[in-house]
From Swiss-Prot:
It comes from Influenza A virus (strain A/Memphis/4/1980 H3N2). It is found in: Virion; Host nucleus. Encapsidates the negative strand viral RNA, protecting it from nucleases. The encapsidated genomic RNA is termed the ribonucleoprotein (RNP) and serves as template for transcription and replication. The RNP needs to be localized in the host nucleus to start an infectious cycle, but is too large to diffuse through the nuclear pore complex. NP comprises at least 2 nuclear localization signals that are responsible for the active RNP import into the nucleus through cellular importin alpha/beta pathway. This is Nucleoprotein. GO terms for cellular component: helical viral capsid; host cell; host cell nucleus; ribonucleoprotein complex; viral nucleocapsid.
Length: 498
């Protein structure tokens, strides 16, 4: 993007930093990882977990959720003011899995939020370390993106389930800050705005009074974040229109859905970061690795190297395939739910299959599931190559895509052409070109019509051997274009609903 100079890098967003040079950024991200690792080690001690139990991803998720809940001030305030039966607003907890007499047992633990906050701050040199909390939120969000398809949420807001490649970060909490905003897809931003406009239509006081002023500034801020993700002038102009509307209503919803559809071909820039579970950082820290001193980046080789040397385990339900569970978590670790599967297969070195072909449910285990025949197995999270994460949508072009997902949102900066199914996308653009935004609409449609299949994105960029830490020898992959490129291909993934 042309305006790169005015943007803070992800790592600065991640660490609330002022302008820092590369070394300082690597150190401050490393410091954040150290803090998560130290916290995790301390929690494993508190919970008396064995080394194996501490490397169980389900335990990691529970511990991460406990600290996120302990620091969720708005929800904590709400719980204090609206006490509900059987829920102690001052406590947090969840299922912890232990190996007892050769069987996996579930144990529900409960801790004072105050105590969890104390352990977290102590692990982070007394700071609240918001960046570390956001990092865990993004890991949970990436896992949700890989596990569930947001069909229902899309339909509810009047969008099309085939637009799922725009929905990165749709389950991120609002309090996830600048780092969270950076990883949200176009569809996620559009959905948040549509929900807001619908509330305004149904509730006369939504935009009024003292609260209404705050609401209005939140609305305009979200419009600006979305505008900043678009890469063409016409799409940005359309966002200005939506933002400046006196009284946002159905016309704005129409414009937003139009711009979301257009993003299937004229893709926006969405950041990608490899956020790993806390049970990866903990053992690395306890083995004596100093992330702050060595430096760390979420968008380079570091997460790949870390995963090459990590042992992570997962509980496996009786009819699940451990290799499929591994693929799910591997994709989540690299924020790659909407990347082209052919490229992922190349980087990973083993075939990456569409969601509907995987015999695995989500990673988390519901409290009513029977533990009797639960097994556990090692997650295979290693890769054959590594590649640099991108925050650009790549330039656009087309190719046969699938019935389920009709476009991709690239994760890796690697040369390829980006598949989307032009006829399907363009079919949605018949009709309505009148009204205030008619000239922008016409311009956007013209650009989409002009998108060429043979165009290559990320020209000259390649993947790298894991020994090539300085990224000196790019290997430009060649793909079998007959293979399916979309993950949510005509899919039957469970829907994510809170």
């Amino acid at each position: 993007m042309a305006s790169q100079g005015t943007k803070r890098s992800y790592e600065q967003m991640e660490t609330d930093g002022e302008r820092q040079n590369a070394t300082e950024i690597r150190a401050s991200v490393g410091k954040m990882i150290d803090g998560i690792g130290r916290f995790y080690i301390q929690m494993c001690t508190e919970l008396k977990l064995s080394d194996y139990e501490g490397r169980l991803i389900q335990n990691s998720l529970t511990i991460e959720r406990m600290v996120l809940s302990a620091f969720d001030e708005r929800r904590n305030r709400y719980l204090e003011e609206h006490p509900s039966a059987g829920k102690d607003p001052k406590k947090t907890g969840g299922p912890i899995y232990k190996r007892v007499d050769g069987k996996w047992m579930r144990e529900l633990v409960l801790y004072d939020k105050e105590e969890i906050r104390r352990i977290w701050r102590q692990a982070n040199n007394g700071d609240d370390a918001t960046a570390g909390l956001t990092h865990m939120m993004i890991w949970h969000s990436n896992l949700n993106d890989t596990t569930y398809q947001r069909t229902r949420a899309l339909v509810r807001t009047g969008m099309d389930p085939r637009m799922c490649s725009l929905m990165q970060g749709s389950t991120l909490p609002r309090r996830s800050g600048a780092a969270g905003a950076a990883v949200k897809g176009i569809g996620t931003m559009v959905m948040e705005l549509i929900r807001m406009i619908k509330r305004g239509i149904n509730d006369r006081n939504f935009w009024r009074g003292e609260n209404g002023r705050k609401t209005r500034s939140a609305y305009e801020r979200m419009c600006n974040i979305l505008k900043g993700k678009f890469q063409t002038a016409a799409q940005r102009a359309m966002m200005d229109q939506v933002r400046e509307s006196r009284n946002p209503g159905n016309a704005e919803i129409e414009d937003l859905i139009f711009s979301a559809r257009s993003a299937l071909i004229l893709r926006g820039s969405v950041a990608h970061k490899s956020c790993l579970p806390a049970c990866v950082y903990g053992p690395a820290v306890s083995s004596g690795y100093d992330f702050e001193k060595e430096g760390y980046s979420l968008v380079g080789i570091d997460p790949f190297k870390l995963l090459q040397n990590s042992q992570v385990y997962s509980l496996i339900r009786p009819n699940e395939n451990p290799a499929h569970k591994s693929q799910l978590v591997w994709m989540a670790c690299h924020s790659a739910a909407f990347e082209d599967l052919r490229l992922l297969s190349f980087i990973r070195g083993t075939k990456v299959s569409p969601r509907g072909k995987l015999s695995t449910r989500g990673v988390q285990i519901a409290s009513n599931e029977n533990m009797d025949n639960m097994e556990s197995s090692t997650l295979e999270l290693r890769s054959r190559y590594w590649a640099i994460r991108t925050r650009s949508g790549g330039n656009t072009n087309q190719q046969r895509a699938s019935a389920g997902q009709i476009s991709v949102q690239p994760t890796f900066s690697v040369q390829r052409n980006l598949p989307f199914e032009k006829s399907t996308v363009m079919a949605a653009f018949t009709g309505n070109t009148e009204g205030r935004t008619s000239d922008m609409r016409a311009e956007i449609i013209r650009m989409m019509e002009g998108a060429k299949p043979e165009e290559v994105s990320f020209r000259g960029r390649g993947v790298f051997e894991l020994s090539d830490e300085k990224a000196t020898n790019p290997i430009v992959p060649s793909f079998d274009m007959s293979n399916e490129g979309s993950y949510f291909f005509g899919d039957n993934a469970e829907d994510y609903d809170n």
